[in-house]
């Protein structure tokens, strides 16, 4: 943070807000703050604040009792960046309770900028050491965190922890006290340089660890049969069992009892779908069941899972190749063997009460169709993590659109069903899409690339006793050659492909899972055979060496490491990000957000750890972050091609044509992208259902009205006009202005201003336009007419169109409902006395409307800033990081609440512009200046600006020259500091 002469006043204001009156305005960064892990409330994790503080400090000191690998791994990228910048740090820890992990200390000691000392409690007279303090030197400022959080994974992310973040001038009493205390402990005779004591402590740590393991392993064991029955379902598995039992107990009144029931489980990879199905079948107690899989290895593991859950109440067997145990109660079969013996085999169509199909997204294949046509069970039960198929097959329809339970990656993390992951987006070497397309192996398997991969794999490490990594490549040849190069460097690796036998795959998996020994593998290289089905819970590192082409495949591949196992606390995901067009899919996949909202994508990149529940974290280095931002900017997410797939998937899921409301309910593509692409949802359906279902027709007048209202109101930024439309749809055609005012007061507890009434009037009479062409295009779109006394009445043409077309009625009602819901979720609660919402995005036209201007000003005139005399508002529009061809303004943030900007050219410090901005005249003293910023102009779709609140000009205008023309510099202060994720995105 850049400090100036007002620092003491700002610090005083922060203290007054913190400890005297919370309503007083002050800089957020200078207030005292309670830091707790509270994702459901404030959305914070202690780890995120530590990262922020480290990234802006000039030096740091930590004194913590406990340090573990899980605690430092999420900080490794930040520590590496600090090393590059020469930012030094001191870390003091202790042997207290032999809890601190020596591996973590070794990892930190490998950084040249960090000095570590180790406090020996016995030398200090058996005194305990339980400090948790973090001191960040920011020049004249000290940011200090003290409380309960050690450097451990759970303390920094999920535990109930209380920490206070306090800010002090460097010479302040509190800062001096805590620094003095740290320095005293640092220089204490019991504090030793790490190198002097690490070997001895390693022995002590392992000895204590062994004692703990013996203690826990000494607990009495249950018999094998009893222990099977003691396995308890997790939250997802219990919900599924309850829902399936309810389905089987439900009577289909008037239905055909010979028609089997159907149900679908959608659950993220690693959440325990096989166990879930076993618990579900245990609940409904079928006489016989068939479990169908596509690989022998999965069938045999599934049999063991069922036996663990259901015990000896059933007999179990397999139907695989020559091993055909057909007389068992529950049979586990591969699809290949079953298809081979459908006609001459031992199973009749009614032999099984329940048939479970694992990885049911494969069921579009002819072999699965043959099986489903042959058998007639009482229940078809399908399981998959990814029902969305790019081949057009409708998995949902196959199971009657009956989803018994659905839990995706984010929900699974929230429910602690998966192993936490720490994802690192790392810039690859200069590799792009073309290199993969041309299979340029000279780059893909070069020694430089191999060295780079190994260096990162070693630095970011793993959880557990040794490395057990899966590496996903773009081709088998790349995987084969990389495996060879790794082996040549003394590592133990294999390459697997679809050509390898089942036994070879099983052997490789066994070797990777080993805890020790000469047989143990370090890495397995493959392309896609590990995407699904094969289960190695011990995997503790996943490396992605290919472009992200699909969020589905991305989640499948990182999911190979997400299964929980006793040998690991977390899994490390290393994603080597080249210059790929589809990099924007990475934040989509990590967040699980399928709306393709670009702002949310950017937020994931800027502050990814904060969007994930639990201990998991997301980190990008500077280069990879830049590459993803560029991909987001250039991505086309509102084209017909990009919208077709989510529409198809939602239609499959629902079993009908979706309404515009369904997209938000099911978290799919943002409907506003549909409006941008096609004008209206009706026009979109015409394209989607061109050769499909008939959903009705709308005449030209109705289409024109729907298009006008969608384009003017569909972004849901305000609902005033919607209140009028609802009155008309409810049959009220006269005295609409009075009725609207009454409804407005009920809705917002205040009267609409005269300017706002006039603004609504202009929209509803189709008189808010910029050009003559806009005026002509929107003719005959008036919803209301103005009577002589100023009252509003419904326009006759609009009422007639509503009466003549039921489909128009329904589409308009759906649009209104969508706008109301979106407004309440996104825009309600405007900033100050405006209708604008902080951190939402607005176009030039939006700003004119939201500020109730009488005119819709063209972009050329409003660009930069424009003063509206009637409303006394002056929006300032900043294109941050303009391209080389733009006028060379030097607008830039100094800090989260300070921006330096330049006026338009050919403006002197004595100009009226300066009067408006610096409020130098009596007419200007009540002016309101609002800041809108967008990141360059590179986004291929959006030309909107983030609204960052009210600003005021500080000091006096400074005259400058811009390309020889007069201009003046302005120091703007923001009333509200920019939110961290937005600030990071704009300034990175």
Report the location of each language-model feature.
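Conserved helicase ATPase core of P-loop NTP-dependent helicases/translocases
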Residues: 300, 318-319, 323-324, 343, ...
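PLD/PLD-like phosphodiesterase catalytic module centered on the HKD motif
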Residues: 1-234, 238
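Conserved interdomain linker/interface between the two RecA-like ATPase lobes of SF2 helicase motors
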Residues: 403-470
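Long, largely alpha-helical accessory region at the distal end of helicase-like NTP-driven motors
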Residues: 207-233, 458, 463-464, 475, ...
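Post-DEXD/H (motif II) to motif III coupling segment of the RecA-like Helicase ATP-binding lobe
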Residues: 362-422
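Conserved segment of the helicase C-terminal RecA-like domain
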Residues: 551-556, 560-590
